[in-house]
A protein has these predicted regions:
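Carbohydrate-active enzyme catalytic cores, enriched for enzymes
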Residues: 371, 410-586, 782-788, 803-882
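CBM-like, beta-strand-rich accessory domains located in the C-terminal region of large
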Residues: 25, 593-883
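Pro/Thr/Ser/Gly-rich low-complexity, intrinsically disordered linker/stalk tracts
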Residues: 26-71
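Low-complexity, Pro/Ser/Thr- and charge-rich linker/hinge segments at domain boundaries
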Residues: 26-35, 40-45, 132-162, 720
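Bacterial N-terminal signal peptides
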Residues: 10-19
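Recognizes extended acidic, P/S/T-rich segments that occur
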Residues: 78-112
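Aromatic-lined, polymer-binding surfaces characteristic
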Residues: 239-449, 460
């Protein structure tokens, strides 16, 4: 075998012994592998029931099924649910009738064994039966049933401002810790304000392009003939600068809290003035949509108004007239009815329901608690809310602590802190007793160790240079340490901002009311003996480090291939590999979330903007159906290995998100999005410590295509054939391939990123964002249906790439890769002293095997494909993969 240093590096024939004995065809499943056959794993709206055909991992499980109802103004549906030990349902263990939600949450754990369940829409035939099993490995969920929570809410007021039973103690506490003084200072700003006559965004809902709101000043707050509460986030010519709902909410809430903490009626009467003006606003705009065309309850103002009025109704009863009380009660009743109609069949059905979980849910809960006893329907609302939380929390995760939305988790912190505290107030149960919350600190740690930037898979808004967690995330970690005694959470919180939550008087109000701590009393020490790599299979991210707790010596390699697909705040980056070196970005995505239509559609959100692969110049669809997953992961002291499968990530039915995004950009979807040409894309990533990263790609298409192997760098790249070097950093990439590839390095994106919003940067609104770094595209010089790629990334100490004895040597490491696409893929790695070795596929079982000698003892770890938990309810096939 020879390598050619002309315009490319090339491995032209097979260089690996020890390969699988039988070549894989397009139809056969290679040994040890699993093939997921489902169109989607985390659908936009549920398309399959669960649980079906497997042992559940939590007891009792939540039972969920598809619902045809997809809009909040459509009539509510009613469902029946039955559970039995037999498929004939002659004996029923559980029978529930008349539920508006398309799910069932049981009240107690089930006995071990096989169970059958079914559901129906009232008046229609039963769907099912569906079977599942319960065994001793299932986690027991001991949360009290919803009726315990609902019945514990008494008629005593106030309830959400501060429980009357805690009033005196809370007043003393807040006076001592400075909360009262801070709130009173804030509340003073709301006095003597000329209140707007309307919400401009409701008045001109859905008509922002007509710019009528630009000339209309009736939505402004004014004081002493000057506008007050002006947006500091957006310039006045951008429509989001007109959002005033947060001011209405904070005005009423802060004034109510100041009233109860001080007993001074002036705060209460001012809060009532604000609330009564707000109660004159229409509950829904004329077209039932937000200014940008979403269903109105999806917008933040709807939840803010609900919470403001709930606080007023709860805390100002003694100051109201009967007429005012009736007006507020009727207003709240209608708002709660609308939200309940909006939530039903949505919260339980959507894999990604951002705004509800981020913002409106704790506000709905506040209002429903406030209205219990005064509104008969409130009990139903509270029961639904409690049960859907039990069924779906955490919304964008499962048990491993990973969060699909990346650093967008900050938008969920209020919900994660307030809702469990309110439940605990009435039940006494700690709702953080869930594997997700115990594992969440490790996700934060591995994706962004203190002193380092994040892994680049942050969802919307990646690329910030912050080396610390946001204050509210640090505060959440402090709460988790307080409630679960998690030193790693407390340590992470302290690294960002000690007492982060305590510095914000409005943070964790429900916990403060109960006298619950915001942090653990003991100071946490740095965690010890942590593995240098961690897999988060629920969200499809692996993080591999050289020196986890020492950023200046760290090399961080991350791969993403997510079962959630490309939806919500995440991007078309399946099988992308990112590299962070010494705490700084090296090989990471590019683009700007707010870079205007063309850049957002074709660069930032697109696979083109990520370190993955293009097929005929096209990338992964913007759809939940375009998903990936991580079948394999192994970790040792010298070698860590992960495999991402993005075979399904390049095909999906047309999705409305694509229409929106490419429509705004005035670009043709067909020019940028692939539809089904990809047949197989398995990416194998090995981190050979201390400084070598190996990427081995298996690529198969249904026809001859041009392949583009994409790599973005925050520094300048220089190409010499298929060798890339990084200016100013000891880093290089040698790309070997089964078909010749030519490298192109660009310094400008396909479309410039324009600062069209001017967010936090008013002066540069409308100007291009600066171009940062460079972008390499290694493209096949001829179309081919199959391609193998072997990339050797050296970061730090550099070694020559040497062809020897049918393999490749790089420093102390020897690699042998099967580069003939007609043969089964395989890869072996060994180091010079014989202390570490890896084989991708054994001939008999197709196992990946990692062998290391540590302290004179040989350690061997093995794996075949392992199905992710989220895929257990869908169709898949296996050739001895682990189910």
């Amino acid at each position: 075998m020879k390598f050619f240093r002309t315009r490319v590096f090339m491995l032209t024939i097979c260089g690996l012994l020890c390969g699988a004995s039988q070549a894989a065809s397009n139809e056969a499943i290679p040994k040890g592998e699993i093939r997921i056959l489902a169109n989607e794993l985390q659908p936009d709206r549920r398309t399959f029931p669960t649980p079906v055909g497997h042992a559940v991992d939590v007891n009792p499980p939540a039972f969920c099924w598809p619902s045809p109802r997809d809009y909040f103004l459509k009539p509510l549906l009613t469902y029946d649910f039955q559970l039995s030990r037999s498929a004939d349902f002659k004996t029923l263990e559980v029978s529930q009738e008349g539920s508006n939600g398309s799910f069932a949450q049981l009240k107690q754990p089930l006995a071990e064994g096989t169970w059958c369940w079914r559901y129906r829409r009232q008046g229609q035939a039963w769907k099912g039966p569906y079977s599942f099993s319960v065994d001793s490995t299932a986690r027991i969920d001991r949360r009290p049933p919803s009726e315990v929570f609902v019945k514990a809410i008494t008629n005593e007021r106030p309830r959400i401002v501060v429980p009357r039973v805690r009033l005196e103690a809370f007043r003393a506490q807040c006076k001592t810790n400075g909360v009262t003084a801070a709130l009173c200072k804030t509340a003073t700003a709301y006095f003597d304000v000329e209140l707007p006559q309307c919400d401009i965004l409701m008045k001109y809902s859905g008509r922002e392009k007509e710019s009528l709101w630009l000339k209309d000043k009736s939505g402004q707050f004014r004081k002493n003939n000057k506008q007050v509460f002006i947006s500091t986030k957006f310039p006045e010519n951008y429509i989001m600068s007109q959002i005033t709902s947060a001011t209405w909410e904070s005005g009423v809430v802060d004034l109510c809290r100041a009233y109860w903490l001080t007993g001074d009626e002036k705060y209460g009467r001012e809060a009532l003035r604000w609330a009564m003006r707000l109660a004159t606003f229409p509950v829904l705009p004329g077209n039932n949509t937000t200014y940008d065309g979403n269903p109105f309850p999806d917008g933040f103002c709807c939840g803010s108004y609900l919470n403001a009025l709930a606080y007023a109704y709860d805390g100002l009863q003694s100051l109201m007239t009967d007429e005012q009380r009736t007006l507020l009660r009727n207003n709240l009743a209608e708002r709660l009815r609308i939200y309940y109609a909006y939530y039903c069949n949505r919260l339980e059905s959507r894999a990604v329901e951002h705004h509800g979980w981020q913002m409106s849910m704790p506000r709905f809960l506040n209002a429903a608690i406030t209205m219990r006893g005064d509104l008969p329907e409130a009990d139903r609302y509270l029961s639904y809310f409690y049960d859907v939380w039990a069924a779906r929390d955490p919304e964008l995760g499962r048990t491993d602590g990973g969060w699909f939305g990346g650093n967008y988790i900050g938008a969920n912190v209020t919900t994660m802190v307030e809702v469990p505290a309110l439940f605990r107030q009435y039940t006494g149960y700690n709702y953080y007793k869930h594997p997700f919350y115990r594992n969440l600190p490790y996700w934060f740690l591995y994706r962004q160790p203190p002193g380092s930037v994040e892994d680049g898979f942050a969802g919307d808004g990646y690329g910030g240079n912050s080396r610390a967690l946001a204050w509210n995330v640090a505060a959440l970690l402090g709460v988790l340490d307080a409630d679960l005694d998690l030193p790693v959470a407390g340590w992470l919180s302290d690294q960002t901002s000690p007492l982060a939550g305590g510095k914000r008087p409005d943070f964790a109000w429900a916990r403060r009311m109960m006298g619950l701590p915001l942090e653990n009393a003991r100071r946490a020490q740095p965690p010890k003996e942590l593995p240098q790599a961690h897999l988060f299979p629920d969200v499809g991210v692996a993080n591999m480090h050289r020196d986890l707790l020492n950023p200046k010596n760290d090399l961080h390699v991350a791969l993403r291939s997510s079962p959630y697909g490309t939806f919500g705040h995440n991007l078309a980056s399946h099988n992308a590999v990112n590299v962070v070196y010494q705490g700084d970005y090296l090989f990471v995505p590019y683009g700007h979330r707010h870079g205007d239509g063309p850049n957002s559609a074709a660069c930032y959100r697109h696979t083109r903007g990520h370190n993955s692969v293009l097929i005929d110049g096209k990338g992964q669809p913007f759809s939940p159906q375009a998903y990936g997953w991580i079948p394999r992961f192994l970790h040792g002291e010298q070698i860590s290995y992960v495999c991402g499968d993005a075979s399904q990530a390049y095909d999906a039915e047309p999705h409305y998100r694509e229409d929106e995004i490419f429509g705004r950009a005035d670009l043709l979807i067909s020019d940028h999005i692939s539809r089904g040409d990809m047949q197989r894309f398995r990416r194998h990533v090995l981190f050979l410590r201390p400084s070598l990263i190996v990427v081995y790609d298996e690529l198969e298409a249904k026809k001859p295509v041009q392949w583009d192997w994409v790599l973005h760098c925050r520094k300048m790249l220089t190409a010499d054939g298929a060798r890339l070097t990084v200016d100013g950093v000891k880093a290089s990439v040698d790309v070997l391939s089964s078909t010749p590839m030519a490298a192109t390095v660009k310094t400008e994106p396909m479309f410039p990123a324009i600062n069209f919003m001017g967010m936090y940067d008013f002066e540069n609104q409308g100007k291009p964002f600066p171009n940062v770094g460079s972008h390499a595209y290694l493209s096949t010089t001829a179309k081919t249906p199959q391609l193998r790629v072997l990339a050797l990334m050296q970061v730090g100490e550099q070694y020559p790439i040497i062809q020897k004895d049918g393999g490749v040597e790089c420093g102390p490491w020897t690699l042998r890769a099967e580069m003939n696409p007609s043969q089964p893929a395989n890869l072996t790695v060994s180091n010079r002293d014989g202390s570490a070795a890896f084989v991708l596929k054994t001939p008999d079982r197709g196992e990946s095997v990692l062998t290391e000698t540590i302290g004179g003892q040989q350690k061997v770890v093995k794996t075949v494909d392992r199905i992710p938990d989220v895929a257990k309810d869908v169709e898949w096939d296996s050739n001895d993969g682990e189910k």
